[in-house]
């Protein structure tokens, strides 16, 4: 898969779906439910947003990467103090389960030269366009950005400029600043 200079995400990659392991992922990680294998690749050091799904997500990186995570139950009135976000380093080749109650978003690289390449396994249809004519019913619907994707955007993010729900308050964490100290 490509390694862009920014971050790119493909919800479902046909080449990955055709691998024999795709059936095993569906059977063993999702209990036989249809799933999609996609990827998130590139270079990133910032939080920008947090998202959650109503199902677990599985990630597997070809290089070490960092996930910026928080707990969904720490969101109060649609807001989350970014001081509650914690960084977790994931070793290359280690499969991690990001629970439905875990706020997360794009991985961060540990090496700017290598970037990150992360396989993303989710229930089929996740992170795809909302059905035509979807009407928000208020509440959590205000955060619904795509199918099975509730998004909290930092005010400094591109997603906030596109109209995403503003959720994280405080610093838009940049792990490259931590590495410089």
List where the protein language model places each region.
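Active-site region of the double-stranded beta-helix
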Residues: 1-92, 105-181
